[in-house]
């Protein structure tokens, strides 16, 4: 197409895709597809992995916004190395996440596929496995955090974590009966106003025979936090389903370690409760004895 049209296309493309200051135009390749001109620009200012992931993320947004269902990156003419291409694809995959399982109308969803072609491109299986393992863990975390409180209550959450056993993780679930015997009263107190159970779940990954102490990760898993009798304002109540994001991060992390067969030992611990007002709920001023034997006066539930 004529020079003026190319400049117009490039200007439009830069506005929609390259809004971050870390990007700096260096060279671009234009392809004409069905009378539409698309540009792929190599515009990395600094050569860190995160920059290429951000480029992939922005590229995915551009493709989806313009309803481009299939895109091919020709590796033989691309200035990016195989590792850089892997990072770009990883960024696009992360951006493709969409929690839409409860949407009634999915017909408007545009599936965007991004391909790398050319004999120059050789898949790095080690890096790809690492990135895919990371992706699986991140998506699990996002799925758990995105679930509404009426679906992902402590009972359901504990069940979902047990499904990680198929990846070689050792999962142990301590229910209310066991927690009472262990004198885990501080944890039980938070959830005693709910009709749901309260749980402590440990997730262990043994990736090496080394007897050194494992890495430990602890995550808060309040599936919904009304504040109990110290009730939270209605304005902020709907966001209290995210009060379990810490535990979801731990769960996703352990899955990633298992999938990549990480050569470390690690253990994750998550407490799963629902903080609700009720006839049996914990009151401000209550005193409980914790697992350590320390007594705690509850001033705010």
Residue ranges and their predicted role:
Residues 1-214, 218-221:
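Short amphipathic alpha-helical segment within the helicase RecA-like ATPase core
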Residues 83-87, 156, 182-186, 227-235, ...:
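Short acidic, glycine/serine/threonine-rich loops at helix termini
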Residues 174, 218-220, 227, 269-271, ...:
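Generic beta-strand/beta-sheet core signal
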Residues 46-54, 240, 244, 298-301:
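Active-site pocket-shaping loop/turn-to-helix segments
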């Amino acid at each position: 197409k004529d020079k003026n049209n190319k400049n117009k296309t490039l200007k439009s493309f830069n506005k929609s895709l390259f809004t971050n200051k870390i990007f700096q135009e260096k060279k671009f390749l234009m392809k004409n597809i069905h009378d539409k001109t698309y540009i792929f620009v190599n515009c990395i200012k600094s050569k860190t992995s995160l920059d290429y992931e951000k480029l992939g993320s922005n590229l995915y947004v551009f493709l989806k916004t313009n309803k481009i269902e299939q895109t091919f990156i020709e590796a033989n003419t691309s200035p990016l190395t195989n590792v850089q291409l892997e990072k770009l694809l990883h960024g696009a995959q992360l951006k493709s996440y969409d929690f839409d399982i409860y949407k009634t109308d999915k017909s408007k969803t545009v599936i965007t596929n991004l391909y790398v072609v050319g004999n120059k491109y050789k898949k790095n299986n080690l890096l790809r496995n690492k990135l895919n393992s990371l992706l699986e863990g991140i998506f699990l975390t996002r799925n758990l955090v995105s679930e509404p409180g009426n679906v992902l209550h402590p009972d359901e959450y504990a069940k979902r974590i047990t499904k990680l056993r198929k990846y070689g993780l050792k999962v142990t679930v301590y229910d209310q009966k066991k927690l009472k015997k262990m004198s885990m009263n501080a944890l039980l107190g938070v959830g005693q106003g709910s009709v749901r159970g309260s749980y402590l779940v440990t997730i262990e990954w043994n990736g090496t025979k080394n007897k050194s102490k494992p890495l430990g990760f602890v995550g808060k898993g309040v599936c919904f936090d009304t504040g109990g009798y110290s009730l939270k304002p209605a304005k902020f109540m709907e966001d209290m389903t995210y009060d379990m994001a810490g535990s979801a991060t731990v769960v996703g992390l352990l899955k990633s370690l298992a999938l990549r067969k990480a050569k470390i030992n690690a253990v994750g611990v998550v407490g799963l409760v629902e903080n609700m007002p009720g006839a049996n709920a914990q009151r401000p001023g209550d005193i409980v004895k914790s697992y350590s034997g320390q007594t705690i006066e509850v001033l705010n539930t």
